[in-house]
């Protein structure tokens, strides 16, 4: 049996083409998932936090601050400061 001699540069070129093809497949797969609406876990968490803040803010805005005996409170939600209306019996910061 005769052995087949393949030049090294041919092998390297084939490996590079295989690698480029695999990268293109991954890129297409990622784009297709985005088009279908799939989100990565970090994107989902960011979205959930954003929606939670919007719900919280809309609940705060729906409560009128015209009630007597209320003051503006600051509390920590999801690592950021936000304002809320609370009774003076709660822990409040008068502003």
Swiss-Prot record:
Domain of life: Viruses
Chain positions of motif Nuclear localization signal: 26-30
Compartment(s) of residence: Host nucleus
UniProt GO cellular component terms: host cell nucleus
InterPro entries cross-referenced by the UniProt entry: Cucumo_2B (IPR004946)
GO MF annotations in UniProt: RNA binding
Coiled coil: 8-40
Residue ranges with Basic residues bias: 23-37
Major subcellular site: host cell
Protein's GO biological process: symbiont-mediated suppression of host innate immune response
Region (Homotetramerization): 8-18
Keywords linked to the UniProt accession: Coiled coil, Host nucleus, Host-virus interaction, Inhibition of host innate immune response by virus, RNA-binding, Suppressor of RNA silencing, Viral immunoevasion
Biased composition (Basic and acidic residues): 38-49
Chain positions covered by the region annotation Disordered: 16-49
Pfam families named in the record: Cucumo_2B
Family note: Belongs to the cucumovirus/ilarvirus protein 2b family.
Subunit structure: Homodimer. Homotetramer (dimer of dimers).
Function: Acts as a suppressor of RNA-mediated gene silencing, also known as post-transcriptional gene silencing (PTGS), a mechanism of plant viral defense that limits the accumulation of viral RNAs. Forms a homodimer to measure siRNA duplex in a length-preference mode. Binds to both siRNA duplexes (19bp) and long siRNA duplexes (30bp).
Protein name from the UniProt record: Suppressor of silencing 2b
